[in-house]
Amino acid sequence: MIDTLRPVPFASEMAISKTVAWLNEQLELGNEQLLLMDCRPQELYESSHIESAINVAIPGIMLRRLQKGNLPVRALFTRCEDRDRFTRRCGTDTVVLYDENSSDWNENTGGESVLGLLLKKLKDEGCRAFYLEGGFSKFQAEFALHCETNLDGSCSSSSPPLPVLGLGGLRISSDSSSDIESDLDRDPNSATDSDGSPLSNSQPSFPVEILPFLYLGCAKDSTNLDVLEEFGIKYILNVTPNLPNLFENAGEFKYKQIPISDHWSQNLSQFFPEAISFIDEARGKNCGVLVHCLAGISRSVTVTVAYLMQKLNLSMNDAYDIVKMKKSNISPNFNFMGQLLDFERTLGLSSPCDNRVPAQQLYFTAPSNQNVYQVDSLQST
């Protein structure tokens, strides 16, 4: 069969498509130089996907980093084996990306599609990349034998995509988070706004109140006795491996240290339960608690977001938005964001089949959207 290729309307000079018939033929022939990338939400991927495909997903709030070019494609894979497989084969294999249907692309808006952006980045990195005409739905309808389906899944594969998880046809918003990405400890004064202008002058020089008892700050805040006294802080959660607990021997403060570096290889999520318990202990004793790392924009933010997710029953996006409204220069590293996504699924917050009802009607309204959040039960009394 002759390979069917045609220019993609939104980027004809850089991206071409493959038909589902062509892909079926390659799978029938056992082509071992074919790398399939499923760009749908993870729930849909786990429910059913084309055989041998690997899933690539990204939180909606991280799209700006992808657009700015601060992330290599390999960084989008949350599973190490998928990342390694992509790294080994992307330079030699034919890479085919697919979303659910690839039907909404056109010359005017397709260039803003994340799938289109990913195609461009793959081309820039030297990959032979294509998109699948009609996407997964068309391939499954015509060649279901080459689809792997999880019959034990609790959610239907027809559930609507979750925007926080999938790439697919998501559009890049100018309101996305700032594009700071580093595997090293970062200086909060180096943060920039979406247009590249510094944020340092607008950032507070003291801990930021996230909840009436919960404060987010940097290492400097943890060494300022006047600040600690002003905010009634008696508990200090130090999310670094090497910064000292300065007043530990004085007996006036209770410390907990989480020995994690700001690096993609670190597993911060394993410490979520004890960090959340420590924060709750401070709340129970009507004490303020400071969560800090070095710069106060990555590790400490990740822990704070995890706390809000569990205690307020929030999705990662909503919890992140609350923190960002209070402190605009936050920038957790990409791997920590992936761990928050896993935590979201563990809490059952991302499942379309989750019909849990909050036990208490206690509310907090975030100005960034119309969602209503439980928070009164977390306020110190």
From Swiss-Prot:
Gene3D superfamilies: Protein tyrosine phosphatase superfamily, Rhodanese-like domain. One of its GO terms (biological process) is negative regulation of ERK1 and ERK2 cascade. It is found in: Cytoplasm. Its main location: cytoplasm. Residues 176-203 are annotated as: Disordered. Residues 206-349 form the Tyrosine-protein phosphatase domain. PROSITE patterns: RHODANESE_3, TYR_PHOSPHATASE_2, TYR_PHOSPHATASE_DUAL. Residues 189-203 have a biased composition (Polar residues). Belongs to the protein-tyrosine phosphatase family. Non-receptor class dual specificity subfamily. Interacts with MAPK1/ERK2. This is Dual specificity protein phosphatase 6.
